[in-house]
């Protein structure tokens, strides 16, 4: 069942040629996986680059933070949490004995706005200090600026928020959002990556379909009301999507003018509205002045490619609809979107064996034995060590789920080289596997290295679970 109604671009006053230009820009600058454009509450353009599909949830990375913000807003609306509540009061059992005076003062507001006072993202150091409890680790990392004075993008702040919400509501974060947000929206497929205790990261790890992301943006645009029901408090949306911190000092964002517009409560401000933003190009962009929502999933290595492409390509087409023939040409293009399968030959029809010569951030450990066997009727069976076996198609893709999560693979021979692309299809990431039948050497290299580590086997398990931690 669709979450949003459909219409043509012209019917909603948008140029299909402008959307066409946006598709061109995305394909030139990033590896796009999906796009959905919503105007006046109607989907006017939607497409998935094969092998990605409409029904497949996609890892959102830090776009997850915007959903955690909603959970905080629900807890506040229920009277269970306040913006000035302190970490030490809500989670007293997770406060280290040597917590600093500044750590004592940190509140929900400081966490939401990422103005706790750490000089940089504290996540890695916090986990090194307290491998079993990130909350304690976060409070032990030294603060270098007074709270509330400087924004530093800090993943651990959102983790602490998630634990605070769980403490005051008595619900785990996924369960709370399933009941209060996703189920009323008609979303039943949300999946969360977790730490080893089973707790959701909160700052990343949510998987949703592109339409679910777009429907979330549309819900924000409608002040939290869906089908006459108030799912998110309107005053929370207004507060969360307002600037609370200046980001103009952030050198990391210097190439992206939208990232200099400020930070709200787990939302980025933008030149024409606001957005939820995730690594490698996961985007939910809301432009209230244009009654517009755009959802994108991708494997982007150029982080400044979005949302600038929307403003450059799409905004000039607002209020300038094109003839019906142009709408149809766009619809035809959207149906044919595809990433390129591996090119090369279907033969020779022989097996090959090689061992991984691992580089830094390789997807498979050094010495992993790779076996390539032709299959009756075409394609290949690939054995990657002892625990992972997948099938690969020629000129297309074949799907396998060796450890729970699907991987979709395309391959071909290029002389003595066997080349395969393994798409971890619920994420932005793929692995380029190369087997040299002549030398017996192989490599497995990520197109973009997952932020949760390079080992492929980990990303094929559902749910992905990393890091020790207490519940």
Predicted features, each with a name:
Residues 59, 78-116, 140, 168-204, ...:
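Active-site helix/loop module of the DD-peptidase/beta-lactamase fold
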Residues 278-338:
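Structured C-terminal helix/loop/strand segments within mature extracytoplasmic catalytic/sensor domains
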Residues 117, 121-152, 158-194:
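A small/polar active-site loop signature that marks catalytic segments
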Residues 238-294:
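Active-site Gly/Thr loop motif
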